[in-house]
From Swiss-Prot:
Species, as recorded: Schizosaccharomyces pombe (strain 972 / ATCC 24843) (Fission yeast)
Phosphoserine: modified positions: S83
Enzyme class: hydrolase
A single BP term in Gene Ontology: lipid catabolic process
Keywords from the UniProt entry: Calcium, Hydrolase, Lipid degradation, Lipid metabolism, Metal-binding, Phosphoprotein, Transducer
Protein's UniProt name: 1-phosphatidylinositol 4,5-bisphosphate phosphodiesterase 1
């Protein structure tokens, strides 16, 4: 059934006064009818909207599109997109991603896309194949859809996105001020969700590739309640979480019927999964068992018998348009040169066989061919002994003979049990050749001996002044492996709320935050989660917090010591899947007055636990002038929920309270800078035994980050950063905790956890030489801001962040108009004296040189120098939101030596 556009009423601004009268009001175009519309429920209005279509029939059609072996997996289609989004939100290079070799046989399989655009799809058929795509090296996600060869892409897309949704349906869009009907359509070809297209109005569009998650039902309840929408609409409400301008945003919709709602969810999730599948299909994949190469082009014939042989030929323009569709950022000059090599009969058009040759030419990487020839003495096969020689001399691998043999056999061809060029390339791209040394650490040490991935102002999505508070900040942080989050609690009209006090930020319910934490606390890592509570609530609302946390967290909340008579903190292993509260505690009477002056302006989170005695003296002056306020009273019921992170106001490192194993000090960066070098040795000594947290100062209104290396070198366990800002500081933080899967914990070096040692005692400062050959790039993704006529012109910048105040920088030349396979062949040499290579970082940035001379960074990768492996390595790139750029990599040769 087609979904016709319904004439929507004029939008009416729904202020707080309107919302207070009715949980939900559909606005009327008549000013005189406003009072009547306040009593009109959304359900009644929704009944007037047309039915989107027959979802059951669409599902049956979709089943027909699947091969028999995949029909069992169809039931997971609705969950698959969210699972993939969750996986892709983590920036760690997982083993599964490396199982996809960046070859180009998929071009052959997707010729039908171009033919469809040319109107020649009558006889062309496509046959796609299953791809393993797992969250880690051991477990696969639900298998991606396999499409039967009797159906083409047009049929599949029409099934995923019904015609009614393609043409546009009336949905209600909910914003802060308005509720209005919008014509919403989904274009399966471009992948854009569009609002009010072809209605004569300015329209908004959103690419499904930018969708991070789709929330519905109870998972979106907090948004529905925030906008005061009746619970009767819960089943038809869905929230699209997407990324735009490097920020998380939310789009809220209500479908007219439950069937329409379900069809929209399936269309959005199905198209997102399909597009990811399209990007993967046809690549030279590595099988999950044995990780052997499969060349699908030998097994598939998507062309079959065409009615007209001439329609099976492509000219240079066709190939260029196809490469643009498939994000192959190659210049016209490069494509023309390759095209001419493949055009054997010089006809100016490619047959299918010639196109296969064209693809093989694109796939050929001369730099790997040269390496292969060097270690095989020109042979077309690499023997076991030659492979062993390559690993030991080039890659500096320390593997025993049996391990090398097992690795070699797993990559050998089934035909002759020998490693050819394709298998060798597969190895270079596999997790077995990762550029980063895997983290294998003891998790049985006390908590104070670990660095803990920590977030500051977790609830904010943007700036500290006037920004938006959202549970998305908590969800995204937890999905990325954060293990210490912050909640600023304030009195709300109907219970505690979370916001950044006195800064005009929005508010969210405390209970909604707790619900989100409960759901996502351990989805990535089972190790304990710290919740830093900053309390600004009255005693009654504090008790409400206690009650709800006990109810929501249950046994996962640690409310008493794990064992009796403890003298040291428990280990992460002792606290698997446990939640620890960090709460300000005091031995002084609860009714005392504070010496805090009333501060005007931006609230510095945690200030009540960080000020030194020097600051206290200045505040006493304020008291004499009559500027005083009642200290926040932390009720005993709440203090008792923090057996291992009792936050104390810092007075002196020598006091008895500073030597209790369960206390924690919190300092702003401003406080540490103010005390300077005098504080450094005492703080470092304190952090050998006890917990400490450092967070950004209040003047960072843009939510920027400091360099966390400064505080890691002092042994600070919880260096809290603004995770909403993916700047250099956060990239360095992510690099330190990089792991697959992420744990959120990293054991400190011995000098920072063993009493009696000092920094550098494991080894004197040494001079190192780091040589990196920047060889080439692979399938660099086109930056969104580029115009359709502009081709990527990349260059590489390398930075070394060590103890120097300014990082070392080196830049390559610009490769103009080639983002598909740029070749640099340049060498960076870095020499320096290093005593703390545990915290020293190397950072790779890929820039685009614009036609107007403006440069922009579109990809990055950061890694600790001491964990950077030597030899030929592919580094997997991230975009500037910290998301994986699938199949985009830099090919390097790395050498480290002491001099």
């Amino acid at each position: 059934m087609n979904c016709e556009m319904v004439t929507s009423p004029e939008s009416v601004n729904l202020g707080d006064s309107n919302r207070a009268v009715s949980p939900f009001c559909l606005p009327d175009c008549s000013e005189n009818a406003v009072a009547q519309t306040r009593s009109k429920t959304l359900d009644n209005a929704a009944l007037d909207l047309p039915y989107v279509g027959n979802r059951k029939k669409s599902e049956q059609d979709f089943f027909k599109m699947l091969s028999s072996r995949d029909r069992d997996a169809h039931s997971t289609l609705r969950k698959r997109s969210n699972s993939l989004s969750s996986f892709l939100s983590t920036k760690s290079t997982s083993a599964s991603e490396n199982k996809f070799h960046g070859g180009l046989n998929w071009l052959s399989l997707k010729l039908n896309l171009l033919l469809r655009l040319q109107g020649r799809m009558n006889s062309a058929r496509t046959n796609t194949s299953m791809n393993p795509y797992s969250c880690d090296s051991n477990e696969n996600l639900s298998t991606l859809s396999s499409v039967n060869q009797n159906f083409n892409s047009r049929q599949l897309l029409a099934t995923i996105v019904p015609e009614s949704i393609q043409n546009g349906c009336s949905l209600l869009r909910i914003t802060k001020k308005k509720v209005r009907q919008r014509k919403v359509s989904l274009d399966p070809i471009s992948g854009y969700l569009m609002l009010d297209k072809n209605t004569g109005k300015a329209y908004k569009k959103l690419c499904v590739d930018d969708i991070k998650e789709i929330r519905q039902g109870r998972d979106a309840r907090n948004y529905r309640e925030q906008y005061k929408i009746s619970s009767e609409n819960e089943k038809r409400w869905f929230t699209i979480i997407y990324c735009a301008d490097n920020k998380l945003k939310a789009m809220h919709m209500i479908s007219p019927t439950l069937d329409a709602h379900n069809q929209w969810i399936m269309a959005l999730e199905g198209l997102k999964t399909y597009r990811l599948n399209e990007f993967i299909i046809g690549l030279n994949l590595v099988c999950h068992q044995g990780e052997k190469m499969i060349d699908y082009s030998e097994n598939l014939n998507p062309w079959e018998k065409l009615e007209k042989e001439q329609s099976a030929q492509l000219d240079l323009g066709d190939v260029h348009r196809m490469c643009q569709m498939l994000h192959l950022n190659a210049s016209m000059e490069f494509l023309e040169e390759t095209f001419q090599k493949a055009d054997a009969d010089h006809s100016g058009k490619l047959s299918f066989e010639e196109f296969q040759h064209f693809v093989s030419l694109l796939k050929t990487r001369s730099e790997i061919v040269d390496i292969f020839k060097e270690y095989t003495s020109g042979s077309d096969k690499m023997s076991l002994e030659q492979f062993r020689h390559f690993l030991s001399t080039s890659q500096k691998a320390r593997l025993d003979s049996d391990s090398i043999r097992t690795l070699y056999v797993s990559f050998c061809s089934n035909d002759d049990s020998k490693m050819g060029l394709i298998e060798f390339t597969s190895f270079l791209l596999s997790p077995h050749n990762s550029p980063v040394v895997p983290v294998i650490q003891d998790m049985s040490r006390p908590l104070n001996e670990y660095l803990i991935s920590s977030s500051h102002n977790t609830y904010l999505l943007g700036k500290q002044f006037g920004g938006e508070s959202s549970i998305e900040g908590y969800i995204r942080s937890l999905q990325r492996g954060c293990k210490c989050i912050e909640i600023d609690c304030w009195d709300g009209p109907n219970g505690p709320v979370v916001c950044h006090g006195h800064t005009f930020t929005s508010m969210i319910k405390f209970n909604d935050v707790i619900d989100a934490i409960r759901k996502y606390a351990f989805v990535v890592s089972p190790y304990p989660l710290f919740i830093s509570l900053e309390i600004h609530c009255c005693p009654d609302q504090q008790r409400q917090m206690v009650s709800y946390m006990k109810q929501a967290f249950g046994d996962t909340l640690v409310m008493k010591p794990v064992t009796a008579n403890e003298s040291v903190l428990p280990s992460p292993e002792d606290l698997l899947n446990k939640i620890l509260l960090k709460v300000k505690c005091s031995a002084t009477p609860l009714h005392q007055f504070s010496t805090d002056i009333l501060k005007v302006g931006i609230t510095d989170s945690s200030t009540d636990t960080t000020e030194s005695s020097e600051l206290e003296n200045s505040e006493l002056t304020g008291l004499r002038k009559g500027k005083r306020r009642m200290k926040n009273i932390i009720v005993q019921e709440l203090q008792q929920l923090a057996p291992y992170a009792r936050s104390l106001k810092f007075r002196n490192f020598s006091l008895p309270e500073s030597k209790t194993y369960s206390h924690i000090f919190s300092f702003s960066e401003r406080t540490i800078k103010k005390h300077g070098k005098a504080m450094v040795p005492r703080l470092s000594k304190h952090n050998l035994r006890y917990l400490c947290r450092v967070y950004p100062g209040p003047l960072r209104v843009g939510s920027t980050n400091f360099n966390p290396q400064v505080y890691w070198r002092l042994g600070v366990q919880m260096v809290a950063l603004n995770w909403q800002t993916y700047d250099t500081g956060l990239q360095i933080n992510d690099a330190l905790f990089i792991a697959d899967p992420p744990t959120g914990y990293l054991l400190k070096p011995p000098c920072q956890r063993i009493i009696g040692t000092t920094v550098g005692e494991e080894g004197l400062p040494r001079k190192i030489k780091l040589t990196i050959d920047v060889i080439s790039g692979q399938q660099l993704r086109r930056a969104r801001e580029l115009s359709n006529s502009e081709t990527l012109s990349p260059y590489v910048e390398i930075q070394v962040h060590s103890m120097e105040e300014s990082p070392f920088r080196w830049c390559s030349k610009v490769v103009h108009e080639n983002g598909f396979r740029p070749f640099w062949g340049e060498t960076m040499v870095y020499e320096s004296i290093i005593s703390d290579d545990f915290y020293s970082m190397i950072r790779f940035l890929v820039h685009h040189r614009g036609s107007n001379g403006n440069d922009s960074i579109f990809a990055n990768f950061t890694c600790p120098i001491d964990r950077l492996q030597q030899g030929y390595r592919h580094i997997r790139l991230l975009d500037m939101q910290g998301e994986n750029l699938l199949f985009s990599s830099l090919f390097l040769k790395i050498k480290k030596e002491d001099i």
